[in-house]
Amino acid sequence: EGAYRVMERCGAILVQDTNLPHLRSDSSILLYEFKMCLNAYLSTNPALKCRTLKEIIDFYGDHPKEGLKYGMGILLDAEYNTSGTCTDPKYILDKAACQRGAQEEGLLKLMDGHKLDVLVCPGITDCSPISGYPSIIVPAGYTSDNMPFGVTFVGRPFSEPTLIRAAYSFEQAARARRAPEFEGINTDTVPGI
């Protein structure tokens, strides 16, 4: 059953053909934040075997069978192409420009124009992190080659209760989540598991 049919079955009124406005996207912003936040999280938990992004990269470099099923492109890009701090002038300027475009000229204009409570996007979208608006990604199914995919629910500023209700209702109706399979992996050796 398609994700949109599940939503209709749950009572959603769908508005089709709402094209997301072109949002200025600079993925380096997300990479800066990813590295900074991941390092901050890892450093606060002494039980974890890896305490930095670099240590995770080194671990998977030494143990590719344990976790390289999906590659390390984003990890490497964040580690080696950003400082890991959000004080770089380029980061600050790019983030401000992206947020202006995504907020007033982008998502809010689209949601107001179509009277939307929640915007639903197939897969992962960068419109929410760029805008700073709340979002939730929930499982929606699997591709023909058994790769999981989800739908992203994006809300208006401070609309978390509405967003959570919509995403939770969909998730309960779709029942698309499957526990991950760790074939032949000793989870005691994988950081964070």
Residue map of PLM features:
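Glycine-rich, small-residue loops and helix-cap segments
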Residues: A3-V6, L20, E79-I193
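Short helix-loop capping/hinge segments that flank enzyme active sites or metal/cofactor-binding pockets
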Residues: Y32-A102, P139, D145-P148, R178
